[in-house]
């Protein structure tokens, strides 16, 4: 199966797994998905993630191998409330949103985190302000 928008796919899978309070979620392995997982792990939104190969028999004797990422989600307390409260896509394929580093302001008391795609790779809004670079505003995490 091919996905057009891998960022939305990653966000939707994580959001749905959080709603169902699953321990882990399976993502298709792309460079963008790995970058998102690194940011989520560094900021403490997930426990861990790892890559693995999954092979399946299709179309007679051909063997297709697909790489996946397993993300171990993080919850708080006995009631297992998710660490990720809100995951919202901002820049979409039909409507791109670009920002300069001067236009990145702290919001919601510093709780909300923005992820940008820049020439230096995927970075958070804090890092973008620190380095003085702007880029495409992909999504926000709360």
Swiss-Prot record:
Task: Give an example GO molecular function.
Answer: structural constituent of ribosome
Q: Indicate where this protein resides in the cell.
A: Plastid
What is any one GO biological process for this UniProt entry? translation
Using the UniProt record, give the first listed, main subcellular location: plastid
Gene Ontology cellular component annotations, sorted alphabetically: plastid; ribonucleoprotein complex; ribosome
rRNA-binding: present as a keyword of the record? Answer: yes
Q: Which UniProt keywords apply?
A: Plastid, Ribonucleoprotein, Ribosomal protein, RNA-binding, rRNA-binding
Please give the subunit comment from the record. Answer: Part of the 30S ribosomal subunit.
Purpose: One of the primary rRNA binding proteins, it binds directly to 16S rRNA central domain where it helps coordinate assembly of the platform of the 30S subunit.
The family note in this entry says: Belongs to the universal ribosomal protein uS8 family.
**Cross-referenced PANTHER family:** 40S RIBOSOMAL PROTEIN S15A
HAMAP family reported for this sequence:
Ribosomal_uS8_B
The protein here is known as Small ribosomal subunit protein uS8c
């Amino acid at each position: 199966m091919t996905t057009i928008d891998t960022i939305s796919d990653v966000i939707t899978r994580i959001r749905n797994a959080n709603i169902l309070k699953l321990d882990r979620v399976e993502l298709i392995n792309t460079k963008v998905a790995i970058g998102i997982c690194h940011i989520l792990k560094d900021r403490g939104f997930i426990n861990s993630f790892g890559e693995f190969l999954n092979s399946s028999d299709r179309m007679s004797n051909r063997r297709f191998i697909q790489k996946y990422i397993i993300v171990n989600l993080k919850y708080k307390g006995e009631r297992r409330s998710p660490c990720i409260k809100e995951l919202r896509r901002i820049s979409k394929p039909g409507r791109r949103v670009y920002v300069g580093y001067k236009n990145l302001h702290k919001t919601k008391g510093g709780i909300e985190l923005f992820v940008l795609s820049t020439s230096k790779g995927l970075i958070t809004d804090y890092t973008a302000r620190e380095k003085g670079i702007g880029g495409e505003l992909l999504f926000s995490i709360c």
